[in-house]
């Protein structure tokens, strides 16, 4: 689903992966959960890139991204968080916020998260029932930081 459609679904309450609304937009659990807690941050309103935001909105967006990372460190036990803003496929601003774990094989842990084979990435997809506790824990951890 495109970022535009996900933001529309988040606004209407029909996006099951929504963690919470934040000052700059929305946080959702990513479709891929091969790295537990992988989140996507989406601005609201949707804009083409970070450079299209005012300085104040840009600061808020990046601050929110760090808050999400702090929450993921608390909830998941990850040792580090990877942050990525690319927008090459879906050409609008959104951020990938990915917990990294010491239990990952070195060849993957020492690289970017998209180096995992597709079968590994597709093996654990977001599931409302399975991920509801994780979603709530992340929501609470973000909420206490806002």
Where are these regions (language model features)?
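HIT superfamily nucleotide-processing domains
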Residues: 1-146
């Amino acid at each position: 689903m495109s970022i535009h459609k996900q933001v529309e679904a988040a606004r209407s309450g029909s996006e099951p992966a929504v963690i919470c609304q934040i000052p700059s937009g929305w946080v959702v659990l990513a479709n891929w959960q091969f790295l537990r807690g992988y989140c996507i941050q989406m601005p609201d309103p949707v804009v083409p890139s970070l450079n299209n935001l005012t300085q104040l909105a840009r600061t808020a967006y990046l601050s929110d991204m760090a808050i999400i990372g702090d929450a993921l460190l608390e909830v998941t036990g990850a040792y580090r968080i990877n942050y990525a803003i690319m927008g090459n496929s879906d050409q609008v601003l959104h951020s990938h916020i990915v917990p990294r774990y010491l239990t990952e094989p070195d060849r993957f842990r020492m690289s970017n998260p998209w180096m995992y084979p597709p079968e590994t990435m597709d093996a654990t997809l977001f599931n409302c029932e399975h991920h509801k506790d994780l979603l709530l824990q992340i929501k609470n951890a973000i909420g206490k930081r806002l």
